[in-house]
A protein has these predicted regions:
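A surface-exposed partner-binding patch
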Residues: 1-101, 165-198
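An amphipathic alpha-helical core segment
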Residues: 137-171
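Compact, glycine/acidic-enriched structural inserts
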Residues: 105-148
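A generic structural signal for solvent-exposed, polar alpha-helical segments
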Residues: 37, 65, 100-104, 115, ...
């Protein structure tokens, strides 16, 4: 029923890569108007045609757009958008995947957040749902995030979206092969150099 819409989401947000199983469930739930996952995870998935946050310059004035420093930042952000595949609004700003070609292909995609200041944050876990649940665990009424995560995992399982683990300490926390924050800095410096700003 949603095959065409899922294919479009894959093309627009993931460069045609297969949509992970949990993301598929969450997308269909949003499109069906279900709010149970939204309530638990605080995610709102992008609709077709929404601009990637790293490519959005609509908030900048003409003067800012003409500024060589800002042009360097925008060019670096556009390059980063090739690797930062954001799929939803939530968390500190936006949430998605880090798909740099130098990352090992034999593991699940790294999860990341981008905040409104263009800072990159890693999420633990092997799936988007695990990463977001771990992040949300620290904002629950339960002060112990390990217990809160287990409770969230149980609620998600009841809704038909079981996590790979209910143990917070067992969540995957593998380091990036390529650090997004460092790469962004390097790209900005390279763009500054192209513009004679060094």
């Amino acid at each position: 029923m949603y095959d065409e819409r899922l294919a479009g989401f894959s093309r627009e947000r993931l460069d045609g890569r297969p949509i992970p199983g949990d993301l598929r469930v969450l997308l269909v739930a949003q499109w069906e108007g279900r709010t149970d996952f939204t309530h638990l995870l605080g995610l709102e998935f992008f609709e077709a045609g929404e601009v990637h946050p790293l490519l959005d310059t609509s908030y900048l004035s003409e003067e800012e757009l003409a500024d060589p420093e800002m042009q360097a930042v925008n060019a670096a952000a556009a390059e980063m958008a090739k690797y930062v595949k954001l799929v939803a609004k939530g968390g500190k700003g936006w949430i998605g995947y880090w798909l740099h070609p130098d990352e090992p292909g034999d593991r699940a995609w790294h999860l990341m957040e981008l905040d409104t200041e263009f800072s990159f944050w890693s999420l633990v876990g092997l799936t988007l749902t695990e990463g977001v649940a771990a992040e949300r665990a620290s904002y629950q009424d339960e002060p112990d995030e390990r217990i809160a995560f287990t409770q969230l995992a149980a609620e998600l399982a009841e809704l038909g979206l079981p996590l790979g683990t209910q143990d917070y300490d067992a969540l995957d926390d593998t380091e990036h092969a390529v650090n997004p924050e460092k790469l962004m800095e390097e790209l900005i410096e390279a763009e500054r150099e192209k513009r004679g700003l060094r």
